Amino acid sequence: MVSVPTAWCSVALALLVALHEGKDQAAATLEQPASSPRARAAHLRLRRCSCSSWLDKECVYFCHLDIIWVNTPGQTAPYGLGNPPRRRRRSLPGRCECSSARDPACATFCHQRSRADAVGVPGSQSSADAFQAGKTWATPGELLRTLRDISAAKTHFAKRQQEATREPRTTHSRHRKR
C-alpha cells in the first residue's frame, strides 16, 4: 500500500512534468511569429484614421480599432492610445484623416460635421460639448468672468449654510425639559 505523502508527491511531480512540457510548446509557438523582422518591431495599433483631437471621443472610438475603454466615474477614457507627434495632430485640417482613401465609411465620418454641431442649436450647448467640438470662448475674459461668478455663488451658498446651522432650532413646547 502507498502512503498518502508519497501519493501526493507523485501527483505533484506528474503535474510539474506536464506543465514543463506545455511551457516548451507555448514557447515554440511564440518564437515562430517573432522570427520575421516585421514582428520584432514595436506593436502598432490598428487605426482606421487619425483624429485631430483626443478630446473628440466619438472620433477616437471610431478611428482606433483595438482600444481598451476603461470606465471611470467622470468619463470613459481610452487606454493605450499612445502619444502621436503634436505637429501631425495640428496639421490635420478636419476632424480626422483616413489611413485608406478607399474606405467610404471613414471618409464620410471624417468629413461630416460632428454630431454635436449637427444637432445642437447655437448657444444651447453645454461648455463640455463646446470644448469637445473644438470651439473656444467668444472673448478672452468670458472664461474668467464665468469662473468668478461660480466662485461667488459657491461663497454665497457656503455663508447661507453657516447661518442656517447657527440659528437655534425652536422645539415644540411639549418636548421642552422642565
From Swiss-Prot:
Residues 96-111 are annotated as: Endothelin-like. Keywords: Cleavage on pair of basic residues, Disulfide bond, Secreted, Signal, Vasoactive, Vasoconstrictor. Disulfide bonds join C49-C63, C51-C59. GO terms for cellular component: extracellular space. Residues 1-24 form the signal peptide. Residues 160-170 have a biased composition (Basic and acidic residues). Transmembrane segments: none annotated. Residues 25-46, 70-178 form a propeptide. PROSITE patterns: ENDOTHELIN. It is found in: Secreted. The record marks W69, V70 as: Cleavage. Pfam families: Endothelin. Belongs to the endothelin/sarafotoxin family. Endothelins are endothelium-derived vasoconstrictor peptides. This is Endothelin-2. It comes from Oryctolagus cuniculus. The gene is EDN2.
